[in-house]
């Protein structure tokens, strides 16, 4: 149970030797997630790693940027509070998961994300950590099959020895049963890439599926449903996907 308490919302402080590459070439402004190029780097790195999971996965989604989650991820980073935020502060139109990272020096986003992914070395897929002390929650968050969107923020916290604080949000939040994931070490289905989505596959990842659900069977039958505010609330999939 102690292991489960720390599994999915973990904060990382990775060794300098792992992440020192090119750190001197970065400035806080260059890492700002308000920049389109930085957003693209973060999304691209996540999708690159999701394509290379081992064993291969049949149902991992191709991730996109979430602008609303970017705002609250940056707000959390700016607070310089090295702890996970409550779920209500990680909610936009979706509830979102969270990875944290702190460093005494600036680290490229791609290296931060790679560091999270590299926790796979301590994980036996479908079973759990190789040792009780192995941290694998960041990796699981990065490769969780139903991650549809990602957004991040970074801030400088001068009063903290680990003065650079990175926050990433993953939407929707992991599939929970009570307080913990029902199958925490099965982040995806181990089959050939896109085997679960042959009609909507892009370079080994499943393309966007609808994040909403219709509440009534008649939603797709009524032409005017999306023009009526009350009906639209019951037909979110029809009206927004």
Curated annotation (Swiss-Prot):
<dbReference type="GO" id="GO:0005576">
    <property type="term" value="C:extracellular region"/>
</dbReference>
<comment type="function">
    <text>This protein is supposed to help spermatozoa undergo functional maturation while they move from the testis to the ductus deferens.</text>
</comment>
<feature type="disulfide bond">
    <location>
        <begin position="226"/>
        <end position="239"/>
    </location>
</feature>
<dbReference type="InterPro" id="IPR003582">
    <property type="entry name" value="ShKT_dom"/>
</dbReference>
<dbReference type="Pfam" id="PF08562">
    <property type="entry name" value="Crisp"/>
</dbReference>
<feature type="glycosylation site" description="N-linked (GlcNAc...) asparagine">
    <location>
        <position position="175"/>
    </location>
</feature>
<keyword id="KW-0968">Cytoplasmic vesicle</keyword>
<comment type="subunit">
    <text>Interacts with A1BG. Interacts with KNG1 isoform LMW.</text>
</comment>
<keyword id="KW-0732">Signal</keyword>
<dbReference type="InterPro" id="IPR042076">
    <property type="entry name" value="Crisp-like_dom"/>
</dbReference>
<feature type="disulfide bond">
    <location>
        <begin position="210"/>
        <end position="241"/>
    </location>
</feature>
<feature type="disulfide bond">
    <location>
        <begin position="219"/>
        <end position="235"/>
    </location>
</feature>
<feature type="glycosylation site" description="N-linked (GlcNAc...) asparagine">
    <location>
        <position position="132"/>
    </location>
</feature>
<feature type="glycosylation site" description="N-linked (GlcNAc...) asparagine">
    <location>
        <position position="118"/>
    </location>
</feature>
<keyword id="KW-0325">Glycoprotein</keyword>
<comment type="similarity">
    <text>Belongs to the CRISP family.</text>
</comment>
<protein>
    <recommendedName>
        <fullName>Cysteine-rich secretory protein 3</fullName>
    </recommendedName>
</protein>
<feature type="disulfide bond">
    <location>
        <begin position="197"/>
        <end position="206"/>
    </location>
</feature>
<dbReference type="InterPro" id="IPR035940">
    <property type="entry name" value="CAP_sf"/>
</dbReference>
<keyword id="KW-1015">Disulfide bond</keyword>
<feature type="domain" description="SCP">
    <location>
        <begin position="44"/>
        <end position="170"/>
    </location>
</feature>
<dbReference type="InterPro" id="IPR018244">
    <property type="entry name" value="Allrgn_V5/Tpx1_CS"/>
</dbReference>
<feature type="domain" description="ShKT">
    <location>
        <begin position="210"/>
        <end position="241"/>
    </location>
</feature>
<feature type="disulfide bond">
    <location>
        <begin position="194"/>
        <end position="201"/>
    </location>
</feature>
<dbReference type="Pfam" id="PF00188">
    <property type="entry name" value="CAP"/>
</dbReference>
<dbReference type="InterPro" id="IPR013871">
    <property type="entry name" value="Cysteine_rich_secretory"/>
</dbReference>
<dbReference type="GO" id="GO:0030133">
    <property type="term" value="C:transport vesicle"/>
</dbReference>
<feature type="signal peptide">
    <location>
        <begin position="1"/>
        <end position="19"/>
    </location>
</feature>
<dbReference type="InterPro" id="IPR014044">
    <property type="entry name" value="CAP_dom"/>
</dbReference>
<dbReference type="InterPro" id="IPR001283">
    <property type="entry name" value="CRISP-related"/>
</dbReference>
């Amino acid at each position: 149970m102690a292991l489960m308490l720390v599994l999915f919302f973990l904060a990382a402080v990775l060794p300098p030797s792992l992440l020192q590459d090119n750190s001197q070439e970065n400035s806080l402004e260059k890492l700002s997630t308000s920049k389109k190029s930085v957003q693209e780097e973060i999304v691209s790195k996540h999708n690159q790693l999701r394509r290379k999971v081992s064993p291969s996965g049949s149902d991992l989604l191709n991730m996109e940027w979430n602008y609303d989650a970017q705002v609250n991820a940056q707000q959390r980073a700016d607070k310089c509070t090295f702890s996970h935020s409550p779920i209500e502060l990680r909610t936009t139109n979706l509830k979102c998961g969270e990875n944290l990272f702190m460093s005494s020096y600036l680290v490229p986003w791609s290296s931060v994300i790679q560091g999270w992914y590299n926790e796979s070395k301590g994980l036996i897929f479908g079973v759990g950590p190789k040792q009780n002390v192995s941290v694998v929650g960041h990796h699981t968050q990065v490769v969780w099959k139903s991650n549809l969107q990602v957004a991040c923020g970074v801030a400088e916290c001068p009063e903290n020895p680990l003065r650079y604080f990175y926050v990433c949000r993953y939407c929707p939040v992991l599939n929970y049963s009570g307080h913990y994931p029902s199958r925490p070490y099965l982040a995806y289905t181990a089959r050939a890439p896109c085997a679960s989505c042959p009609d909507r596959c892009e370079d080994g990842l499943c393309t966007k599926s609808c994040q909403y659900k219709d509440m009534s069977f008649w939603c797709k039958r009524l032409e005017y449903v999306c023009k009526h505010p009350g009906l639209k609330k019951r037909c979110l999939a029809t009206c927004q996907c």
